[in-house]
């Protein structure tokens, strides 16, 4: 049925109508619904064929051969990913998605779609990445499998958060938490969903719920083995603890999170976690710990000298100079912040502007500082980080930072 429809250039929506919905057409094509004789005749008439022709089965050997061919292409695409050839992986996965049309090929098609979404993310194509995830979210197989549903919703929540669309990110993270509620304890998806929700909630300014979400995430992370997921969970809980007024515990959690990553290959995650720990230590940690972490950040940047890493080091150096009330040094370091660095999310860009504003104010360039504060606040607002925007406006109006209490701009979430 699917092959006949596609051969005629029809969509499932084109075939639907009257007694048929597009979702029902999809279920029939996937072998998940057996139509009545009346509906089968209706479908055949719309396709200009007969029920007998639609019911003709392929030879089992041909179906098996086709499936094995698709699996082989999927394996080749995975090899391309391991080799870092993302463009080749994309072509191979798109071919699998196009060919996997049989009812017995649902799982292969889903895996290809999922991996294609991942590859599009690595190719820095957020629009197509999002479109691929939304297609997966509407896939009948996704909707009938809570684990698959959760994985897609989590990935979509993280993408939207990175793209500066925090309210949507929170919504999909909440959806992920909801669909994982019935999964058995210890499933990684349960912790992943709660980590996505906590991170998006903190970034968007829903700090009143952060401590409770952190407690739930900590309980979910307890049975997890050492590794990236457990590290990410501890990191997220640390952010909630700091905002709740427990900076010492937050720093201890970040230290534990770094220990969890010691034997993993997640270089990008380790670098960002190190930045988060250093920035928080500069805001609330002992002077010797903050200085040691800053020294390590300098060493890491010397090894990984990307525009983004150099910009983050400039932010950290600026924060350190501000901690020592050294306005000229803060301004000198802030001048090295590159707001065009490609890896900066909208939220991170606003955070960079906030540090620029503080440096200019400390160096007595009030007009420049005011302009930077306004740009930072607007950047936060556009991303949906309304609480951070409000804190920025307050700091601009007050003419100085609060001497006591937490600095929410110092919280980097996973």
Where are the predicted features?
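Amphipathic alpha-helical segments of tetratricopeptide repeats
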Residues: 59, 94-101, 134-142, 174-185, ...
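Alpha-solenoid helical repeat architecture
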Residues: 64-69, 104-111, 144-155, 184-196, ...
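C-terminal non-catalytic interaction modules
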Residues: 2-7, 11-13, 22, 30-36, ...
């Amino acid at each position: 049925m699917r092959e006949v429809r596609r051969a005629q250039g029809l969509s499932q929506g084109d075939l639907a109508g009257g007694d048929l919905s597009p979702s029902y057409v999809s279920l029939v094509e996937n072998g998940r619904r057996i139509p009545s004789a009346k509906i089968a005749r209706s479908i055949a008439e719309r396709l200009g064929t007969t029920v007998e022709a639609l019911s003709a089965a392929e030879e089992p050997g041909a179906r098996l051969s086709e499936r094995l061919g698709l699996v082989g292409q999927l394996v080749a695409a995975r090899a391309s990913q391991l080799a870092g050839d993302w463009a080749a992986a994309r072509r191979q996965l798109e071919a699998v998605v196009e060919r996997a049309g049989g009812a017995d090929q649902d799982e292969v098609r889903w895996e290809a779609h999922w991996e294609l979404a991942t590859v599009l993310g690595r190719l820095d194509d957020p629009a197509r990445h999002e479109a691929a995830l939304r297609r997966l979210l509407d896939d009948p197989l996704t909707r009938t499998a809570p684990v698959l549903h959760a994985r897609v919703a989590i990935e979509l929540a993280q993408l939207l958060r990175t793209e500066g669309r925090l309210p949507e990110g929170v919504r999909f993270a909440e959806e992920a938490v909801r669909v994982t509620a019935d999964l058995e304890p210890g499933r990684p998806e349960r912790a992943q969903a709660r980590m996505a929700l906590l991170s998006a909630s903190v970034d968007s300014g829903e700090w009143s719920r952060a401590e409770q979400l952190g407690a739930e995430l900590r309980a979910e992370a307890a049975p997890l083995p050492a590794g990236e997921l457990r590290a990410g969970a501890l990191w997220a809980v640390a952010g909630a603890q700091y905002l709740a007024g427990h900076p010492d515990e937050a720093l201890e959690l970040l230290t534990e999170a770094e220990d969890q990553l010691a034997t993993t290959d997640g270089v990008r995650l380790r670098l960002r976690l190190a930045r988060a720990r250093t920035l928080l230590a500069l805001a609330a940690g002992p002077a010797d710990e903050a200085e040691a972490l800053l020294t390590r950040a300098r060493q890491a940047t010397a090894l990984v000298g990307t525009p983004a890493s150099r910009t983050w080091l400039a932010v950290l150096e600026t924060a350190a100079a501000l901690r020592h009330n050294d306005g000229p040094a803060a301004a000198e370091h802030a001048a090295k912040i590159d707001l065009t660095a490609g890896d900066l999310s909208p939220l991170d860009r606003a955070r960079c502007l906030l540090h620029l504003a503080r440096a200019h104010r400390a160096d007595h360039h009030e007009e420049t500082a005011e302009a930077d504060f306004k740009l930072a606040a607007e950047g936060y607002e556009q991303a949906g980080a309304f609480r951070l925007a409000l804190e920025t406006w307050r700091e601009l109006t007050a003419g100085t930072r609060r001497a006591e209490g937490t600095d929410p701009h110092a919280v980097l979430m996973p």
